[in-house]
Amino acid sequence: MPTINQLVRHGRKVIKEKSKSPALQGHPQKRGVCVRVSTMTPKKPNSALRKIARVRLSNGIEVTAYIPGIGHNLQEHSVVLVRGGRVKDLPGIRYKIIRGALDAAGVENRKQSRSKYGAKRPKK
């Protein structure tokens, strides 16, 4: 326990909170170019081939981002918008690609949660 005098001299040190998406450098989203598009297997109890892309952001940092939704049109040199947000069963993946923005098309035949997947309203 510090004395009053020690607190007057030095004060309390503020603990800075660590960013969960440091590559975005405080921005909500960043534009990037796909360097590699591939699949990855999730951690133990789950089994699948999750779609991922290695993206070089506009600030020069290269990150691995998850491609959400069923099916995608991304390939090398596609320009994408990346946001923060991890995928719980893929270690080391802390970013997601925004569907329906730039070169990433929205998910086809999506009826619910359309705004999260860039899907247009279906015709009646």
Swiss-Prot record:
InterPro entries from the UniProt entry: NA-bd_OB-fold (IPR012340), Ribosomal_uS12 (IPR006032), Ribosomal_uS12_bac (IPR005679)
GO function term, MF aspect, one: rRNA binding
Any Pfam family hit: Ribosom_S12_S23
Record-annotated disulphide pairs: none
Keyword tRNA-binding attributed: yes
Residue list for modification 3-methylthioaspartic acid: 89
Keyword rRNA-binding (UniProt): yes
Keywords: Methylation, Ribonucleoprotein, Ribosomal protein, RNA-binding, rRNA-binding, tRNA-binding
PANTHER family: 30S RIBOSOMAL PROTEIN S12 FAMILY MEMBER
Subunit structure: Part of the 30S ribosomal subunit. Contacts proteins S8 and S17. May interact with IF1 in the 30S initiation complex.
Functional note: With S4 and S5 plays an important role in translational accuracy.
Family of this protein: Belongs to the universal ribosomal protein uS12 family.
NCBIfam families: rpsL_bact (TIGR00981)
Protein known as: Small ribosomal subunit protein uS12
